[in-house]
Amino acid sequence: MSLNFTEYEAKWQKKWADAKAFQAETTSSKPKYYALDMFPYPSASGLHVGHMASYTPGDIISRYKRVNGFNVLHPMGYDAFGLPAEQYAIQTGVHPAITTKKAIDSFRKTLQTFGFSFDWSREISTCEPDYYKWTQFIFLKLYERGLAYQKEVPVNWCPALKTVLANDEVVDGKSERGGHPVIRVPMKQWMLKITDYAERLLNDLDKLDWPERTKEGQRNWIGKSEGARITFKVHGEKDTFEVFTTRPDTLFGVTFMVMAPEHPLVKKITSQPQYTAVENYIADTAKKSEVDRKASTEKTGVFTGAHATHPITGDKIEIWISDYVLMDYGTGAIMAVPGHDARDFEFATKFNIPIKSVLESDMLPFEGDSIMINSEFLDGLNKTEAISKMLKHLEENKLGVREVQYKLRDWLFSRQRYWGEPFPIVHFADGSKGVPVNELPVILPEVADYEPADTGEAPLARNADWVKYMDGDKEGRRETDTMPGAAGSSWYFLRYIDPKNTEAPFSPEAEKYWMPVDLYVGGPEHTVGHLLYARFWTKVLFDCGLVTHDEPFQKLAHQGMILGPDGEKMSKSRGNVISPEDIARSHGADALRTFISFMGPVDKDKPWAPTGIDGVKRFLDRITRLVVNDDGQLVATSEALTPEIEKLVHKTIKKVTEDIESMSFNTAISAMMILVNELYRAECRSVLAVKPLVQILAPFAPHLAEELWEKMNGEGLCALAPWPKYDNTLCADDTVTIGVQVNGKMRGTIEIGVAASEQEAVAAAKAVQQVAAVLGDKNPDKVIYKAGKILNLIVK
């Protein structure tokens, strides 16, 4: 080919940078459009083709919106604190600050190679003090509002990583990072009270343009349940405990109680003969993660030797412990109704505990709705009636109360690692307090020894000079845990709008103009982690009066994974990783961008097909030859278009416009391929067709579009040239296919002119074999004809 993509791609990247083509306007009368990609962890392994699939959709939309009159903010930065960077530093012996900076430089270079239209003047990194100063500032807001607190809680402890992990960081009993075993141990931790926002987080999902599966994922994670909190007495003792149930109507079916092994009453109520068995069971449970306990199929447990008193009947009910009951959920104790709960039924069957039916059914366990039996004053009622009557009875007799509960737990927010934001908290003998705002940022000290300790003590605890804090003559001790990686990413979208502000995390004017994010693109794996945490922090900032919108991301789109050629997830261990730099060298950045867009729907996983990118490269070469010959000379002409080509050009502009708006990029490229084929068939190289083709190609293959735009003497940058308009009258079809009915029964179809008369339609219908067979030699007695829609011939 006459055009060398290596040369012109670098050329246009420089021209865009020199022209500051993609910098968002600080003040503008244009409507705003904030397109954001989830920023990457700057890992030493660099970016792979999957990252390109993440950033291409947002860039296509950004480029499209920019040339349609929007003031576009499309920034990029780095989620630079956290476990991945620190683990790599420990493995290599190089400080994480050094490895992270090197990785960021590598990421930036790769992203620029592919022509993403990021506003690089707004680049951020969460590990920079001028950024995490404001992460600490927001934490202080949480602390001041009582939403950040310390508490000894059972936590997910990873011995290999030597830190605690949040629930969303544990997958199948192992750490998300590295796949190391995780156990449950009690530790004093910082927690964020996300549970205070459970109802708002749940209800406000309805106003978001998000994939339904993601919204449903958050609904399930929040897990709202309406029911009753019922008080049980320990038989023969003064102690009481509570259970939460969504089925108070089944209270008469309770035949045993189960407590979590960690329940504070367990050791107190356990009888002497059962003490050893209970102690051993508690020790065994401590070795299991929460996920293991939920996933276990075989029910295990131990009888405590104690009994509860049924609050209505007064019956004695055995109290057991079992690891399928979690202290973190509900009250840490359950009333077991084995006749109507499969899990309780399995437990009762295994340990020969009585089973009682309180719902009419022919089989047990029966978990559906039926008429109440064996339930005294509830007998004969349906579920709704029985629940209402039982709730009234419990409240009138002070045995229980109505209650709403959530599965959502408070966010475990501290890590016993080095590479993270220091907490702006100092502990004194008489209590803890936040540092004054004018002392922010609390700088993460540079230390040589940053390896985590086996004891669970954070590495910063070994830095005595840093830990010591003087407030006048009062000595305190800095908090030595650090924040999790999710801290910086819970608000980064707000820093982009005003990244150089030294007086505040962002200005009120910038927030009011830019927020919320109009399009957020990222993976569905963040459903119950980052996406939930970002919503929580935004709502807190809204309550603080710092933001005017209580939801950060109005529209969310997920990109599917690019799988290896073998159909498996790309990984170095499988040897199926595709390097974007290699593709850029062999086929060009535009070919990769266009191929990613053409592979299939944005949200679907797609296997890498080497022959596919070859085909896309040929498609781009064919467009090039419509403009220049092999010597690089202009061959595009100024000839008029035939009516057929003119109509197809307008149809293609409309199709690509609509497809970009709906993020159906693969069908947009298909439409351009059809146009290119027709231009070659008609031997048409007119700029009246090729110029708009190049413009609608630009969001996908921006470098080539700029080069061809320049060859055709296009004004200014193609990346900023107004999007081509289409004429709807030229987009209308000349013919239409309509159904033909005889006496209301469909007999076939005809293709006729859009404006065909009734006589023309009837004549065409008579030529259809199935219609003619019914009509014979008769003429219709009545004709019902709606142009372009239906023809019904009535024959007596």
Curated annotation (Swiss-Prot):
The keyword Cytoplasm applies. The keyword DNA-binding does not apply. Its main location: cytoplasm. A motif ('HIGH' region) lies at residues 40-51. Its EC number is 6.1.1.4. GO terms for cellular component: cytosol. Pfam families: Anticodon_1, tRNA-synt_1, tRNA-synt_1_2, tRNA-synt_1g. A motif ('KMSKS' region) lies at residues 569-573. It catalyses: tRNA(Leu) + L-leucine + ATP = L-leucyl-tRNA(Leu) + AMP + diphosphate. ATP binds at K572. Disulfide bonds: none annotated. It is an enzyme of class 6 (ligase). It is found in: Cytoplasm. GO terms for molecular function: aminoacyl-tRNA deacylase activity; ATP binding; leucine-tRNA ligase activity. GO terms for biological process: leucyl-tRNA aminoacylation. InterPro entries: aa-tRNA-synth_Ia, Leu-tRNA-ligase, Leu_tRNA-synth_edit, M/V/L/I-tRNA-synth_anticd-bd, Methionyl/Leucyl_tRNA_Synth, Rossmann-like_a/b/a_fold, tRNAsynth_Ia_anticodon-bd, Val/Leu/Ile-tRNA-synth_edit. CDD domains: Anticodon_Ia_Leu_BEm, LeuRS_core. Keywords: Aminoacyl-tRNA synthetase, ATP-binding, Cytoplasm, Ligase, Nucleotide-binding, Protein biosynthesis. Belongs to the class-I aminoacyl-tRNA synthetase family. This is Leucine--tRNA ligase.
